[in-house]
């Protein structure tokens, strides 16, 4: 259990701005092997981030005046909190990927561009569109049901952090290995770590499904069958998005970088919201 907590806190330290400092940080420790073992807790980080964002969004929906634009405001501020909690870690990956692969047809040149800390036109446009689409889709879900919007936020943050584990498992790491912060995560991710990630994901999905009957009084307005169909549509859409991204990385780069993992998380999160909306 002690090792489990250490790996989780190390993953939290790596993927978010949530402070793990002082004596706690000393107790957690660090090594490339530990960071590699912590990869399975990537979705577990999504559980905490998703819970915080979902709770904040639910609070906004409760305290703000109930108008037609309330879901839009709550979605925008909830999304902003998510960006703050992660330090725009995944959005930065999305920008770098689209700068590199959108701005160059050559593999080596694309990898160089992706390492550049400056943001180009392709990257800026990709991040702006992703944020706009995320807020718009969440507002759409909120117009159907406030509870549905909050539940979607929670599950999407977990599921979208699960698919990158498959990318790590199936594709080789490319680029500057020595200078890559993600290299320990890319080396020989174990089946146990992969299973840990999927257990986190299944727990999140089970929580939402099992609480359906308990939350009917706050107007999800969906039968159990309809909720399952909508969730299935969202999960499938997210999975398809992962497959498309993985194929793109293989075709263009013959592997992945840390930026590719962040971009995958962002695209899969968007696909989940879209799939859920279509499945309603």
Swiss-Prot record:
Its main location: membrane. It catalyses: alpha-ribazole + adenosylcob(III)inamide-GDP = adenosylcob(III)alamin + GMP + H(+); alpha-ribazole 5'-phosphate + adenosylcob(III)inamide-GDP = adenosylcob(III)alamin 5'-phosphate + GMP + H(+). GO terms for molecular function: adenosylcobinamide-GDP ribazoletransferase activity; cobalamin 5'-phosphate synthase activity. The chain crosses the membrane at residues 44-64, 69-89, 111-131, 135-155, 189-209, 226-246. Keywords: Cell inner membrane, Cell membrane, Cobalamin biosynthesis, Magnesium, Membrane, Transferase, Transmembrane, Transmembrane helix. Its EC number is 2.7.8.26. The keyword Transferase applies. Pathway: Cofactor biosynthesis; adenosylcobalamin biosynthesis; adenosylcobalamin from cob(II)yrinate a,c-diamide: step 7/7. It comes from the Bacteria. The keyword Transmembrane applies. Pfam families: CobS. Its cofactor is Mg(2+). It is a multi-pass membrane protein. Belongs to the CobS family. This is Adenosylcobinamide-GDP ribazoletransferase. The gene is cobS.
